[in-house]
A protein has these predicted regions:
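Bacterial N-terminal signal peptides that target proteins for export
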Residues: 2-14
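N-terminal signal peptide c-region/cleavage motif recognized by signal peptidases
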Residues: 20-24
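N-terminal "mature-domain start" segment
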Residues: 28-83
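Short, surface-exposed coil-to-beta transition loops
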Residues: 77-81, 92-94, 153-161
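A short acidic-to-branched-hydrophobic micro-motif
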Residues: 80-113
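Long, charged/polar, surface-exposed segments that mediate recognition or autoinhibition
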Residues: 102-134
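Signature of long, low-cysteine stretches enriched in small and polar/charged residues
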Residues: 123-162
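Surface-exposed amphipathic alpha-helical segments
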Residues: 172-210
Length: 210
């Protein structure tokens, strides 16, 4: 699916998305927030977090990954992010999943806005591949993915950025891990994507959002 791009509106949206994208690497995890300041508090049930406006469910553990962070930069509920992590041996695989409300931007537009910020966190970052991405079993979704190589603390690192256009909602996944974990990490990420792939955030109109 696609949207007509409005240059002026796209620039404003791009600025806000870029600002939000810069928080994962710089911000500490928000864990155990006081209820007054926790935007997810009213929607938590059992071990899962349910985002009220989109209906997206984030379990505490899934596909071997453990949920670590509950973060938001927009208390209206339009932008939020959650981090998952899995350890193979003593090496971590970190995945930041963000769901944002964008207008007039395609998955490729979303990806191109975020890419420079993601690459800036790694030394000698280079693009390994980028292009349209197929979400298995979901022909209805438009997605775009880039895979990058870089270094973190002098250790070769692998990073992928995937933007998905759900319509009213857009999602992105930023996965990072040491390059030596490439094969097992890719397998683990496929399991994580499979665990989420059948979820479809509801549109604002469908969900009757505030």
């Amino acid at each position: 699916m696609g949207f007509r791009t409005s240059v002026s509106r796209g620039m404003l949206i791009g600025a806000s998305v870029l600002c939000f994208a810069s928080t994962p690497a710089a911000a500490e995890c928000v864990i155990g927030s006081e209820p007054l300041f926790d935007p997810f508090a009213p929607y938590k049930g059992g071990s899962a977090i349910v985002h009220k406006d989109s209906g997206f469910v984030f379990p505490a553990e899934t596909a071997g990954f453990r949920r670590l962070c509950e973060m938001t930069t927009d208390f209206s509920g339009d932008n939020f992010q959650i981090r998952y992590e899995r350890t193979i041996g003593d090496q971590p695989i970190a995945v930041d999943i963000a769901v944002v409300h964008l207008e007039d931007l395609t998955a490729r537009d979303h990806y191109r806005i975020i890419k420079p910020t993601v690459m800036s966190h790694y030394a000698s970052a280079s693009i390994e591949s980028e292009g349209d991405y197929f979400v298995s079993g979901r022909d209805d979704l438009s997605a775009y993915q880039g895979i990058f190589d870089g270094q973190k603390d002098n250790v070769p690192w692998h990073v992928s950025l995937t933007a998905i256009d759900y319509g009213y909602w857009d999602a992105r996944l930023i996965a990072s891990y040491p390059h030596e974990l490439d094969v097992p990490a890719q397998e683990a990420l496929m399991e994580l994507v499979a665990a989420f792939q059948w979820q479809s955030p509801v549109d604002e109109e469908e969900g009757g959002g505030d």
